[in-house]
């Protein structure tokens, strides 16, 4: 409940408007909305899985394509290659990565070849986020669900979306340590950018 600081008020706020999942490309009039939003923010950005084309996306809107993995019968098969037009428009690619378990590699254990080829061809950057594993839901969320009711929109914003790396017993620290170290080493080996979920460390929404 902090007051809105001066830098976050009025036109040309010193902040970036980021639109992300679900899948933003499924929303109607998204490009028109981004066009209207330009004067109010320092920059606009959208994160999409790249499966659907975003027509008329403003040129100065940053497009981050974050491909998803195909799953079948609960098994992870492979990363889905985005639509070719989305790859051509993309400013960055972003992937989630986890370390192999018991020497068993999954699609989350490496970046697909086509992404390395895209980076080499376009000279654009690829970001890699270590996967964070959870042991349970945050305590406040669990208490509300135990009462037999769903979270309100306000609660989803103020409670459900606030997750802290420091809440005891919430995250699987051993697996997360392996994932962070593995992703960092992979990035150094291949010249990619390590992208951490900083809001978890600062207990921010």
Language-model segments: which ranges?
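Conserved alpha-helical substructure of the radical SAM core
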Residues: 1-18
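Active-site beta-strand/loop signature of hydrolases that rely on acidic residues for catalysis
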Residues: 21-23
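Conserved AdoMet/S-adenosylmethionine-binding subsite of the radical SAM
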Residues: 25-205
